């Protein structure tokens, strides 16, 4: 859950 680089790692959810 990298909120700083959420576009880099493959996350199941996007915490914007």
From Swiss-Prot:
Any GO BP annotation: xenobiotic metabolic process
Signal peptide interval: none
Residue runs in coiled coils: none
The keyword NADP is assigned to this record: no
Keyword terms, alphabetized: Antibiotic, Antimicrobial, Fungicide
Described purpose of this protein according to its UniProt entry: Possesses antifungal activity against P.infestans but not F.graminearum.
Quaternary structure (record): Heterodimer of a large and a small subunit.
Other known facts: Antimicrobial activity is not affected by salt concentration.
Official protein name in the record: Antifungal protein 2 small subunit
Taxonomic source organism: Malva parviflora (Little mallow)
